[in-house]
């Protein structure tokens, strides 16, 4: 996935004043479909994802819905872990998305589906240029 702005390392620096933007051109339904693949470097028992919006950002530039997938080895098929919805303008804390059935994982894929609506809009039946920017991510090891 191409990067429009920011750097991937900004996703894991615990500062949501730094950010990463994928190279998409249309929102609120993202086009082209964009995803972020993360190689954790080792297998963990994946239990939860922490997601934090970029600070001081307009809500319509924040991700509303994303799909989460994971796999243990590079040659495995992706396991669908579900679609998740973020709360708009919540930038001070991570929003936590637990995995229903934690699994051994080395690779995580986040597919960005659509953004929050622009003020005054009530549904996703419009299109405009724009992007999504992500502040920070956390990957939690399941430990029970």
Go through each PLM region and give its residues:
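Short, solvent-exposed loop/edge segments of extracellular or virion-exposed proteins
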Residues: 1-4
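Aromatic, loop-rich ligand-recognition surfaces of beta-strand-rich domains
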Residues: 6, 10-80, 91-144
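Short loop/turn motifs that cap or connect beta-strands within the blades
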Residues: 83-86
């Amino acid at each position: 996935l191409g990067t429009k702005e920011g750097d991937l390392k900004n996703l894991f620096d615990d500062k949501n004043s730094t950010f990463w933007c994928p190279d998409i051109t249309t929102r609120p339904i993202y086009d082209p479909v964009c995803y972020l693949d993360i190689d954790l470097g080792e297998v963990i028992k994946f239990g939860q994802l922490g997601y934090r919006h970029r600070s001081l950002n307009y809500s319509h530039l924040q991700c509303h819905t994303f799909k989460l997938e994971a796999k243990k080895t590079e040659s495995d098929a992706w396991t669908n872990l579900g679609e998740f919805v973020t709360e708009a303008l919540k930038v001070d804390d991570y929003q936590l998305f637990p995995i229903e059935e934690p699994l051994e994982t080395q690779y995580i894929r986040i597919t960005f589906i659509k953004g929050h609506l622009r003020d005054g809009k009530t549904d996703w039946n419009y299109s405009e240029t724009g992007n999504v920017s992500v502040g920070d991510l956390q990957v939690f090891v399941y430990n029970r």
